[in-house]
Amino acid sequence: MSFDPDTDIIEQTCKSLIGCKINIGFTITLNNGETMSGEVDNCNIVGDCMEDILFPFIHKHIDTFEPGPKQASPDFYNADKQWEWELKCFSNTPGFDVSNFNSYISQLTTNLERKMYKTQYLIFKYEMKSGIIAITDFKLCKVWEIINYTGKYPISLQCKKDMWYNIRPCSFNDMVKDKTAAIFITQLCKAITLTPNKLENKQKIIEDIITQYNLMHQSNMHLNIDSNTGGVAIFPNKSP
């Protein structure tokens, strides 16, 4: 399965920011011409600001790299929108949203390749002190590498009012390369079976997802799912 051919350049560019310090400031000009400047000390805006900060660094090396739509997914495109990139930032413990659960399932049923293989995640860890953002670590991940599969639910997610709301990440240290797309598909299909959310025709959703996966990997994965227990048996021909 192919990924963005510029992945290595993007990863090295992002890694070069580890250790850097970023000051987010503001200047106000009043009607009388008086100005006032200061520093922004609010971690809630770091993610949005990082989009504007990161873009020119990558675009300098890759002229086909471009911003995505504001307040919508993805954060960046590459190669005439053929590849998608999502930016995630956190301090202390990852708590960002990967995607809305129902929305992600819907997108997978229509274009699994784009959401799983043509989208990658740029994940920055930072500290913020006195208005200064210090980038302390970075990882470039596939979606299946940032999910936890050993918790209360088949995949790590946020539950609100007994409904499964947003898909959430695992710990930063647990974002590792030995997780596989097959595990992600297996656990996701189990989640579709068990979710209390209203999803029309869960079995067809699962079949659509598995069919796309098999076509891309030329495999013959079968999922036997017990609708009462959510038990899953997976039989792939080969690992992705």
Model feature map: region roles:
Residues 76-81:
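Active-site beta-strand termini and strand-to-loop segments that position acidic
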